[in-house]
Amino acid sequence: MAKVLVLSGGLSEKEKSYSSQMLDLFVKTYKEVHPNDELEFVDLNTTKHAEVFLSRNTFATYWKDVESDKWIDKLKAADKVILSCSMTNFGPTAVVKNFIDSVAVANKTFSYKYSKKGDAVGLLDHLRVMIVTTQGAPKDWYLWGSHTNWLIGTWKFLGAKYVDTFELNGTKLSVFADKKPYDVVEEFRQDALEKAKQF
């Protein structure tokens, strides 16, 4: 039985949110494939990540105030992480960026002291990560602004041994204009099932 930490980082209300609907679909199919796994659900919008942000003014107390150690412990206790995030101004949502700020901590989730070549060594090397992302533009439309690639690189930096994505791109295109997010997402059920089997 695997322990799975499910992190929702969407910005919109659930019914209108492609990322929330994609997350729900992936989790539903994941449970079908892995019925004995234990899932813990967290909406990052209901945590300190929606209240306390890293800045010069908060630097001295940020990691304590945002409960960094609590979240790092959750990552260390989990076998898998499923994280959902929509693109916001060419990057991840603020709560997802803030979550990464709170857990990317030297000598806790990565370290340079074990490196032989000067590069960082990720300490979360037990984790398998599924990144569920959405964006209005087509895939790779903004090569300089891919929240998906940023998240892939970040989790690999932190040492995750497996990182995959379940993506919905182009939600602002005319092909989706007359459809509700739920109906659009349902078209990806088979993809979700295949991803869940591999994860």
UniProtKB/Swiss-Prot annotation:
The keyword Oxidoreductase applies. Pfam families: Flavodoxin_2. Disulfide bonds: none annotated. FMN binds at residues 17-19. Keywords: Flavoprotein, FMN, NAD, Oxidoreductase. InterPro entries: Flavodoxin_fold (IPR003680), Flavoprotein-like_sf (IPR029039), FMN-dep_NADH:Q_OxRdtase_AzoR1 (IPR050104), NADH:quinone_OxRdtase_FMN_depd (IPR023048). GO terms for molecular function: electron transfer activity; FMN binding; oxidoreductase activity, acting on NAD(P)H as acceptor; oxidoreductase activity, acting on NAD(P)H, quinone or similar compound as acceptor. Binds 1 FMN per subunit. It is an enzyme of class 1 (oxidoreductase). Quinone reductase that provides resistance to thiol-specific stress caused by electrophilic quinones. Homodimer. NCBIfam families: PRK01355.1 (NF002370). This is FMN-dependent NADH:quinone oxidoreductase. The gene is azoR.
